[in-house]
Every structure is written in structure tokens, then in C-alpha cells.
Amino acid sequence: MRSSMRIFVLGTVLCLAMAGAALACTSVMVGKKATADGSVLVSYTCDGWYDHRLKVIPGGSHKKGEMVPVYHNICYQTRPGKELKKVGEIPQVEKTYTYFHVGYPIMNEKSVVMGEYTWGGREENECQNAIFMIEQLQVLGLQRGATAREVIKIMGELAEKYGYADGGEALTVGDKDEIWLFEITGPGPLWTPESGKPGAVWAAVRCPDDSYAMGSNRSRIAEIDFDDKDNYMYSPNVKSFAEEQGWWKEGELFVFHKLYNPEPYGSPYYQQRREWRAYNLLSPSVKLAEDAAEQYPLFQKPDKPVAPQDLMALCRDVLEGTRFDMTKGMAAGPFGTPTRYAVTKDMKPEDRKGNDWNRSISLFRCSYSFVGQVRDNLPEPLAAVAWFGEDQPITTCYVPIYAGTKTVPESYNTGDRIKFDPKSTWWAFNFVGNWADLNFAAMIGDIRAEQKRLEGKFFAEQADFEKKAAELYKKDPKKASEMITKHVGDYMTQLDKDWWALAWNLVGKYNDGYRITSDTLEPLGYPTDWLKAVGFGDHDAEPKK
């Protein structure tokens, strides 16, 4: 009995530790009538040490009786000590679709796109007898589903049958017509596959076509209308589990996030600051309170139609121009860096143990981000485009990758995270981001100029390329596929080359405290206010305290 209890406690702790490690991501979803071009949009920032390597995993036909392995640690495959672990297998389906694999998969050939964020949840939902982590569900959903609704149903049914072992998770799942928010948590420690009960608790809500929504590490689904099957989906135990736990009883208002995530993770404004910023930028007329005690309404209408570039800007945001501006104040150092490294509890002052830095949407430890754009007026291989960026958003550059792309350059699917690799595109972006922190205020202008030049080119050429590729697709789908793959590969290869060139240009231009050009050597020095704050000119033997 004691041994069993020790195993149970250890398993629970490990599950919570894995969930806690992923509590960092941000996603925004936008309905098709709220966008500038009628597309469905989604954005996602993968904010932690996750697999940055982008790979195209081909679909195919499968024989009856084939089995699919189920793994843990899929998302961690560049992190030491996180080996891929097989925990089971399930029957394969007759046909699977090609999908785009990265730490948390983002798109399939059927133009379904997907973002993610973790929300932790309650200990009462943790389960060690289940097998599915969220990224494995994403893989299977994208391999097997042709629409957002279909993908959600597939993931929900698989989790119910085989059990969900991860912490509370959310996925923003879109296609050419609609986009949904899917949230899932575990069935509790007593669940077993033989119990006959669902192995997960989940719910999904459809984003109104004229609205958008934002999520950042806390459950966001509010009241569920159980009679509205067009706009809500849920597991059969979503009410009964809460009732069995004593959290809810029939006749009371059923608010999913209050029942399954009543105490969100982290410092008080870890999630809220990002949510407020997104709504503040896209719907400034609403004037949401900066420090609201309650959650903001999930859905809002934007003040103006949203374009992919708006979501890119949102991903890159560091609260500039607000009283929380990450580039201002002593914490930004003399050169205005928005980077705030993690602070362990023992490092914090005694009266600040429960506090932390402000949290912006762009984060230095981001592995990759993307903006998904799905249209209903283009053939399937062109309908969805993932504007993909390696490393932190504020210093990345987004390159378009179409759903019909068959391969991507090797530099995008390689790179050891513990060893600098000049053959890895991720390292080009990570290097630029880290070098910029030496003097962010000076270097960010060079970086933004290159972002504007390259992304401007990609957007300017988008319509013409899509028109030509769509015309070719009508005549010869195979040649159109080759055209798409070459176009994407050429862009990605050029971006890799140009970003390494930018990296070495920054090294030469900004070093030893100077801005160096062919005919000037300009000392950058320090801001006057910062010099005063640190006691510049004092003749004391000891540094100013």
C-alpha cells in the first residue's frame, strides 16, 4: 500500500512538473468576417525549450491491422534528458494526411491550422494511467482530420478512449471556414481504461465569424450552452466529473474555466497582461481594465479588420508605449532590452517571493512562432499558409509555408540546442536575438529594417504567386505541388542566408561599445538617466548601493 502510494505521488508530481514546464505559450484566433481578406487567422508563440525543427511528415495509405506508437516527450526532442518514450500503441487508420511537425504541430495538407497554450488545471484531474500528451493528440488529429471540427472530435474521442495524461491544455484549431478553442484536462487519478468512463474532460467553443479570442496559460472557455451543438462540443463527462468532485451541481451556472482552472498558474498578471494587451491592440475602443479581477470576455470584435501582419506585430509585442513597457526602466538595463531572465524563488527578495517580472507576448525563450492564414478561395495546397518564424518573435522574420509544401530546407529541420550550429536557421535567429541584447536600443532598428524588407517582399509577391500556382493546379496538380515546394524552399533558403548575413553585420557594426561603419566610429555610451541612477562620477571606493 505504501509502495503504491509512493508511485502514485511520484507520478502525479512528474505530471505536474511536465505541465508546469509548458506554461508559457500564447495563441490568438480570428474569425473569417473579422479579417482583412476573409481568411481565418491563428497565431501561436511556443515559449520555452521545445523542438524548433520543422519537418514535413508525409501522409499515406495504411494496411488493416497496422498500429501507431504513442509517445511522451515528443515536444522536447532537442532538450537533454527528455528522451522519446513509447507508452503504448493504437490502431492505425486507413488514410493519413501530411502534416507539419515541430514541438507542437501547426498545420496539415487539408489546411487545418493549430495553436496551443497550457493552463495547468487541478490536481484532481491528473492521471498516471492515461497515455496521451497534448502534442501526440495534435499529431493524430492533424494526420486524421480534414476540418477543424473533425480534428477536435478525433482528439476528443481518442483521449476519452485511451486517457489523457497531460495537464490542462488548449488548442486553437482552424480551417478555411471557422476556428475553435479546444480545452482538455485529465480524468482523475482513479481512471483506468477498463473503467468504462471517459479518459478525459474536454470542451470546445466556436469563435464567432466576426470576432477574435486570445488565450495565454489559463482556461478561457466560459459558460457552455449545452443545447447549441453548432457552436459547442464537449465530452460526455464534462458536467458529471465536476459534480462528482463537488465543484458544481445541477441548476448552477456551468462556467468551464471556473470549475477546471479556478487558480491559474504563476504570478497574478502572468496571463492577464498578455490578454489585456491583445484586446487593447485589436479593440482599443473597448478600453478593458488593465488589472481586472475577473477574466476578460473571451470574444471581442476588432476595431478594424485583422491582417496577418497585425498578428505578427502582436506576437512581437513587448508592451511598448504602455506603463508596463518592457524596454523602459532599470530592469531594461542601460540599453532598453525587453529580456527578463527567469528568477528562482531563492533569488527573489523576501517580500517579493510571490511576484515576478511583467510578461509580454514576445519572450526571449520562445522556440518558434507562426501566424496561420487560411482562405476559402484557393485550391487546397494553397489555401493555408503558415507564416513561420524561428526563435523569439521580436527578432524573427516570418516566411510563408503553404499546406501543399512537400519538403523544407534542411537548415530548418536541424540544430542541436546545446551546441552552436551555423548550419541551423534556428541558430541564426537565436544568435541575432542574443547579440541584440548587448545593446537592444541600437540594434533593433537594423533588425526591424530587415524584417520589413523581407516580409514586405513575401507579402508583395504573395498574390501573384498564388494566382499562377492556382492556375497551374487546375492543369497539373503534381507540377503545382512542385512549384509550391520550390517557391517555399527558395524563400526559406534566402531567409537563412540573409539572416546569417544580418548576424555577422551586427557583430561588426556593434562591438566594444561602438556603432561602426566604413567611415565612422560612434561611441554609444550610456543614457544620462541611467548614469545618474548608478552613481556615475561618484568618487567613493565602493560601488553605489
What kind of feature is each model-predicted range?
Residues 240-385, 389:
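Glycine-rich, aromatic-lined ligand/substrate-binding cores of catalytic
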Residues 25-133, 154-306:
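A contiguous strand-loop segment
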